[in-house]
Amino acid sequence: MEYDGRVILYIIKADETSYINYIKPLILAEEIQFPHVLSVIDTRDEWFYSIHPERMVPSLKDQDPVTGEKVIVFESTACLQYLVDRFDTDGTWSGRTVAEKGAVLSWTAYQTAALGPTAKYWLYFKRGYPTRANPVQLPRTIEKQWDILEKRLKEPGQQYIALKDRPTLADLSYFPFAMPWMFTFLGVDIKDWPHIQRWSERMLSRPAVARVLQRAPTLGH
């Protein structure tokens, strides 16, 4: 797909779990309405090495509006950060003050280092190796991460993860791995983390989130 002035968001055909991580930039696209187009690709294609060193999604292609230079961004957190730097001019999603930016950056980075990779490995084992013995350490590790998130959301007035008053990149980063679907898929009761449950309900009530979750399982079909 050639660049035509819209950000190209690279995704793969949706199956039961493949869309879970790439809904992050799709939700952001719905929230801030930047011009974009989805490109459903086959990650086995050699050309995709020019986009991602391991041919993974989400990734994106854009163009510098000043120099015209090609822009390639890969990994979900990097995609989110790039897109808010480019299109979220008032800092709604990335933070408006130094303190807000620090909180958003910290919680987003922490998800990237902790809950994100742990949840993805658990999905990998559950989806790809259903007959393999249960990887005991993974459930324990992910439940610890949910405990940390529960403690954060339990703080007075903490409606969202990084900031109290509104969702940010941190919430988009956590959402796929802390939404009700994920708990159900992994065979865990979200009611054991009541503040996460209420937070996820707030996220699910957002029209942009609802639209993406309705559409995502059909992408590429």
Swiss-Prot record:
Molecular-function GO term, any one: glutathione transferase activity
Pathway(s) annotated for this protein in UniProt: Mycotoxin biosynthesis
The reaction(s) this protein catalyses: RX + glutathione = an S-substituted glutathione + a halide anion + H(+)
Keyword hit for Cell membrane: no
Manganese as UniProt keyword: no
Source species, domain of life: Eukaryota
Record-listed E.C. numbers: 2.5.1.18
Domain GST N-terminal: 1-91
Function per UniProt: Glutathione S-transferase; part of the gene cluster that mediates the biosynthesis of aspirochlorine (or antibiotic A30641), an unusual halogenated spiro compound with distinctive antifungal properties due to selective inhibition of protein biosynthesis, and which is also active against bacteria, viruses, and murine tumor cells. The non-ribosomal peptide synthetase (NRPS) aclP is responsible the formation of the diketopiperazine (DKP) core from the condensation of 2 phenylalanine residues.
Annotated protein name in UniProt: Glutathione S-transferase aclG
Higher taxonomy: Eukaryota, Fungi, Dikarya, Ascomycota, Pezizomycotina
Gene: aclG
